[in-house]
């Protein structure tokens, strides 16, 4: 799927309808008494979190959003209809920021949350409201109030069961394509993944959401490579799957490099559950794989397993393993 994790939009709630200056039309009675109704309230704009959304891409081309205007009041004390509300749907994990893109307004963490981002304007008052003992034929009425309008930023922090991390070209996209319905771009060079890819793996009648995070390089927490804009997507994943190319000349250094970047961004990332996966075992002999696994597993707090995305049995085993981690 196309992915967009940050977008600026303009929202304008509906203006309130104007009050009516109407008078009853009665024979031989001047003005006939006021009967002007109030204006309707302007439509309000809501943000609502939806589980079936994974990206903000819909807002890339539609950046201006307006709710309906309240209808003007009319004679016979008729109040105008309220303007139509507007509900903007966003993925779970979306954060709402003010125009400075720094001040957090709201954070969607659960399905079905609603947040009023712009209130509709109040309807104006009809002239009936101003009738008194000293003024039985008031011509006064008020106009509807303008609806609130803002420029806001929407930022998405992916909420997935499993975040796949590793150096560029570790095989993350191939793994995601093998075990889920995702179709990430795959090639044998660094930074094939330029945006987080999302997929859902089904196993034993259960589903696991996985996020393929763009490859980390040294200095990523300072913006090197694809930078910290993607590290934020790891924060809300329940489990980290650390993918390492088993043919790498220095597995230990490769592992530490990624862990250092995670820790430099946030120490909390190092506290997450982690499973280490040595990938591309099909490139080595079976005995060599066993020896590497034995040596690399020493002094590791996390479980270490092997994987070949070309073998169906290997894919099934990793699905079952991931399910046990997130259940």
Swiss-Prot record:
Cellular compartments per GO CC: cytoplasm
Positions annotated to bind GTP: 166-173, 191-195, 212-215, 279-282, 308-310
Subcellular location, principal: cytoplasm
Residue intervals of the OBG-type G domain: 160-327
One Gene Ontology term of the molecular function aspect: GTPase activity
The keyword Metal-binding belongs to this UniProt entry's keyword annotation: yes
Gene Ontology terms describing biological process: ribosome biogenesis
Binding, Mg(2+): 173, 193
Domain of life: Bacteria
EC number: 3.6.5.-
Keywords: Cytoplasm, GTP-binding, Hydrolase, Magnesium, Metal-binding, Nucleotide-binding
Domain Obg stretches: 1-159
Compartments in which it is found: Cytoplasm
Function: An essential GTPase which binds GTP, GDP and possibly (p)ppGpp with moderate affinity, with high nucleotide exchange rates and a fairly low GTP hydrolysis rate. Plays a role in control of the cell cycle, stress response, ribosome biogenesis and in those bacteria that undergo differentiation, in morphogenesis control.
UniProt record similarity statement: Belongs to the TRAFAC class OBG-HflX-like GTPase superfamily. OBG GTPase family.
Listed PANTHER family: DEVELOPMENTALLY REGULATED GTP-BINDING PROTEIN-RELATED (PTHR11702), MITOCHONDRIAL RIBOSOME-ASSOCIATED GTPASE 2 (PTHR11702:SF31)
Subunit relationships: Monomer.
Protein name stated in the entry: GTPase Obg
């Amino acid at each position: 799927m196309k992915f967009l994790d940050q977008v600026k939009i303009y929202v304008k709630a509906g203006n309130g309808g104007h009050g009516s200056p109407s008078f009853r039309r009665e024979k031989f009675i001047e003005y006939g008494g006021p009967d002007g109704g109030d204006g309707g309230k302007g439509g309000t704009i809501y943000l609502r979190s939806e589980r079936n959304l994974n990206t903000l891409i819909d807002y890339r081309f539609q950046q201006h959003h307006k709710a309906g205007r309240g209808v003007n009041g009319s004679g016979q004390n008729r109040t105008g209809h309220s303007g139509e509300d507007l509900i903007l749907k966003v993925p779970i994990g979306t954060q709402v920021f003010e125009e400075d893109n720094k001040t957090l307004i709201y954070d969607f963490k659960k399905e079905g949350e609603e947040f009023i981002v712009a209130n509709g304007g109040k309807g104006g008052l009809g002239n009936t409201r101003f009738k008194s003992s000293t003024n039985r034929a008031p011509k006064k009425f008020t106009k509807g109030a303008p609806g609130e309008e803002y420029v806001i930023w929407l930022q998405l922090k992916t909420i997935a069961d499993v975040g796949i991390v590793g150096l560029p070209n570790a095989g993350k996209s191939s793994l995601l394509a093998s075990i889920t319905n995702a179709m990430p771009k795959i090639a044998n060079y660094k930074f094939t993944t330029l945006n987080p890819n999302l997929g859902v793996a089904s196993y034993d009648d259960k589903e696991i959401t996985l996020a393929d995070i763009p490859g980390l390089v040294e200095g990523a927490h300072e913006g090197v490579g694809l930078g910290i804009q993607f590290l934020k997507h790891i924060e809300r994943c329940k489990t980290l799957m650390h993918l390492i190319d088993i043919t790498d000349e220095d597995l230990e250094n490769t592992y530490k490099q990624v862990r250092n970047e995670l820790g430099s961004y946030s120490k909390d990332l190092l506290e997450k559950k982690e499973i280490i996966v040595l990938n591309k075992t099909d490139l080595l002999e079976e005995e060599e794989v066993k020896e590497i696994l034995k040596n690399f597993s020493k002094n590791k707090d996390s479980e270490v397993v092997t994987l070949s995305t070309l073998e169906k049995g290997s894919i099934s085993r990793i699905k079952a393993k991931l399910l046990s981690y997130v259940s």
